[in-house]
Amino acid sequence: MRSLAGRIEIPRLRISAIVKEGVDERTLDLAAGHIPNTALPGQTGNIGVAAHRDTLFRNLKDVRRDDQITLTTLDGEYVYRVVSFKVVKPAEVSVLDPSPDEKTLTLVTCYPFYFVGNAPKRFIVRALQVF
């Protein structure tokens, strides 16, 4: 199975981070992580990317519909447009379910953004590939 290594950028929010495969603490201490068993850029399906709310995804709290997200890998550049965002419970993993007819990107971080300790919820951003 191939893995994701690249960069995610959300220019309006001044987010620019390396993306590595996996979401273990060691990976997330250094980079955003591609959530295992989710799609890869360019594939039909749902790509999951997670990062800490107090570091790389700190500015995600200011996301808006239509914000542009770019994922750059060795295979090319993929551009997405934010279509929605919401707060869910950690057990609501259905946000990562495959999207059989679309190329989607789901960003995941802990919520609330200014919470001390283990955050009780997750902030989810959903985007559709535009090119």
Q: Which residues does each predicted region cover?
A:
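Solvent-exposed, non-transmembrane regions of membrane-associated and secreted proteins
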Residues: 1-131
